[in-house]
Curated annotation (Swiss-Prot):
Mast cells. PANTHER family: KALLIKREIN-RELATED (PTHR24271), MAST CELL PROTEASE 8 (PTHR24271:SF22). GO terms for molecular function: serine-type endopeptidase activity. SMART domains: Tryp_SPc. This is Mast cell protease 8. One of its GO terms (cellular component) is extracellular space. Its EC number is 3.4.21.-. Residues 1-18 form the signal peptide. The keyword Glycoprotein applies. It is found in: Secreted; Cytoplasmic granule.
Amino acid sequence: MFLFLFFLVAILPVNTEGGEIIWGTESKPHSRPYMAFIKFYDSNSEPHHCGGFLVAKDIVMTAAHCNGRNIKVTLGAHNIKKQENTQVISVVKAKPHENYDRDSHFNDIMLLKLERKAQLNGVVKTIALPRSQDWVKPGQVCTVAGWGRLANCTSSNTLQEVNLEVQKGQKCQDMSEDYNDSIQLCVGNPSEGKATGKGDSGGPFVCDGVAQGIVSYRLCTGTLPRVFTRISSFIPWIQKTMKVLQQS
């Protein structure tokens, strides 16, 4: 899930993660009622999961790379292994951005149309989206939550969260020529070592109660910062796509 990365790179193999990470803090139960747990299957019928967030009663936003078959969304969850008063709803239409690029991770955003409208209550609520002119600035500290993987390679049963600092785009550009600050966010202060982990993809980066980013990917070095999708750059696409999905 949320990882504190220690400086052991010099003494560990490149792909080793187990000895260098511990995870973040458990969220207060149901304190993030917009969160969605998304389960789906790949072409080999292997199960996967991502995070997402409710942006309308019948629409969940997530990352485009979280697309698959037989997608189901669980709303109102805290511990996904316990019996809770959740709403499990099938997805009838997944609409990833038509220009999503698996290699560069550009346009890593997707909307899911739910089979039925969610019942909003104390543990299930929508979250606000930014205006197209909103711009998250370097130095701003916002929060990510998710059910991502822990240090022992198991996924977290309970929702975890961490505060992460927005970095200057140049930090990510120096590490990857594919980074594009106009549509992406560079997130995570290397000196603090806090980060998202596998399984947190698709979750929201929340600043002052507004979903400003989507957890997208980590750079090829495996180190901080991470790259998130910048939601404000996609508002026209979101509005158009939501209208089409809700009319279908």
